[in-house]
């Protein structure tokens, strides 16, 4: 929906074939999944025709294992409805790009079947053509992605709760205490 034909051929086709693994970098330590709370910034360097990415993301599913990442970052400010808001854009970042590293594996209480890691960007230079969609349209991309993902996470949480309830009921029925 958002990518150019070149981006779709280069990234989407190998992802769809299962030849590559992808990850989505939105969540940040101080903002969670609030796209307007993002601190990660991308500044365009006209001299090199590159975006320079600085910041970090946390709790990123497939974080260390993905080959390609969609990363949400602030690219400026824009006036909307009479007030200044952050301009949010989305970028395609490939694993191995200089300035892109991983933090430690995140420790979680639940949904431990997926490895989540911190993504760190320090003067990470990505080509101008790796802007996904149009500049300033990253908020739409983030919301579209979250809309699809939230139902899956809710289903997982419901399944975990149901499993915990069933296990508890079985335990209570079999438990012996005070001679009963």
Segment roles from a protein language model:
Residues 4, 24, 42, 53-55, ...:
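Buried hydrophobic positions in well-ordered alpha/beta secondary-structure cores of metabolic enzymes
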Residues 90, 100-180:
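Glycine-rich beta->alpha junctions and the first turn(s) of the following alpha-helix
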Residues 30-33, 59-62, 81-83, 108-115:
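Short Gly/Pro-enriched turn/cap motifs at secondary-structure boundaries
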Residues 1-6, 32-35, 44:
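N-terminal glycine-rich flavin-associated loop
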Residues 18-26:
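A short, Trp-centered hydrophobic/proline-enriched beta-strand micro-motif
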Residues 34-54:
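Cytochrome P450 C-terminal beta-domain/meander region
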């Amino acid at each position: 929906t958002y990518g150019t034909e070149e981006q779709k051929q280069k990234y989407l086709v190998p992802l769809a074939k299962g030849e590559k693994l992808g990850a989505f970098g939105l969540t940040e330590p101080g903002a969670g999944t609030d796209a307007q709370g993002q601190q990660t910034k991308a500044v365009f360097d006209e001299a090199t025709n590159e975006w320079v990415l600085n910041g970090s993301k946390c709790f990123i599913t497939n974080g260390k294992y993905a080959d390609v990442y969609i990363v949400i970052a602030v690219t400026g400010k824009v006036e909307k409805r009479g007030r200044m808001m952050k301009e949010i854009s989305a970028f395609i970042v490939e694993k191995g790009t200089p300035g892109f590293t991983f933090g430690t594996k995140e420790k979680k209480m639940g949904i431990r079947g997926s490895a989540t890691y911190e993504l760190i960007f320090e003067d990470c230079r990505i080509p101008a053509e790796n802007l996904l969609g149009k500049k300033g349209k990253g908020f739409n991309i983030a919301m579209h992605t979250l809309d699809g993902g939230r139902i899956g996470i809710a289903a997982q949480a419901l399944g975990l709760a149901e499993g915990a309830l069933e296990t508890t009921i079985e335990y209570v029925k079999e438990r012996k205490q005070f001679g009963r």
